[in-house]
Amino acid sequence: MKNRRLCVFISFVLCCISVLAYSEGSHNNSVNKKTSEKSKKPTLMILPSDHWCEQRFYMTTWDNQGVKVKSPDYQTAFLQDRELTQVISNLGQLLTIQGYTLKDAEQETKAIFKRIAEDNVTMSATSGSVIAESPLDMIKKAAKMDILIQIDWNINSDRSVTFTLEAFDSYTSKRIATATGTGKPSNQILPVMLEQAIKSKIKDFDKQINQYYADCNKHGREIILTVKCWANWDGNLEMENEEGDELIDVIKKWLHKNAVNGAFNLSDATENFALFEQVRIPLFDEEGYAIDARDFATLLRKYIKKECDLTSKVMTRGLGEAIIVIGEK
């Protein structure tokens, strides 16, 4: 009898230990996942600066709804400048050592420029209304990098090289880090000269990026959200629901609940247009997947459909700007 009671007691203890171990393991997995997300470094892409492209005549034009706009021709630059690929590769190695993941700029630009002629506008399936995107906007959206690194350099008369390194948030185009310097005179090839000159500045450059990204983790990433009405729709943002709330108020309430810390700024508004700037969105969703402006705007589009029974279309310009146009697809 005593042996039986002892066996039951031991079984109970082992069961409790198993439950506690499973619970602790699940908790640790959850903590590790959150820690991993917070410690994850942003994804980078390196491109030559606009000034570098302009000085070497690597420029192209694109049609922004009837207006010709100049933009760097990255595809031609990669094809014709023999040193560019090696410069970017060497800089990429320095940044990889700092823990960053890099997107292949040359391959991404090849893929994008193949379809620029047909994809440089997004339009309404109903009325044919359009929104234009620059080649760089398209590269950002396709590559989905967090940070764009641009490099510029000049070889001096004494065979030293002066460089400028800048980092831009791909979502807002804000400059978030910069480094400049001049290397020692050298007879090395340009890519090696640049690498040696940049090495002494890379730690501080990395620190600036980390500080910015830590702020994004804490306070959310900025995007721009525009709400418009199709011209052939008979409603507007001042139309009221059954509770007497205008459509613009319904949208603002949703943003207060879904933006990080309810942070956004209604910069401009009319009955047919609303511009929300400094909208803070989380870097990742609950599953750990990265969120961009389209993802966030799509959630709002679904909410407008559910609450107001209104059809709308989400369009984007790059990663950090979304436009919701209400009234049709």
Residue ranges and their predicted role:
Residues 39-41, 82, 86, 90, ...:
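Extracytoplasmic
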Residues 143-187, 317-329:
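Amphipathic beta-strand/beta-sheet edge segments enriched in Tyr/Trp
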Residues 58-133, 141, 245-284, 288-305:
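N-terminal segment of the mature soluble domain
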Residues 1-27:
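Bacterial Sec-dependent N-terminal signal peptides
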Residues 49-52, 107-108, 170-171, 228-232, ...:
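Solvent-exposed coil/turn segments that connect beta secondary-structure elements
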Residues 296-329:
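A cross-taxonomic marker for long C-terminal extensions/tails that follow the last structured domain
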Residues 24-57, 175-263, 317-318:
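C-terminal/domain-edge helix-coil "capping" segments
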Residues 107-126, 168-189:
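Short, flexible helix-coil linker/hinge segments at the edges of structured domains or between repeats
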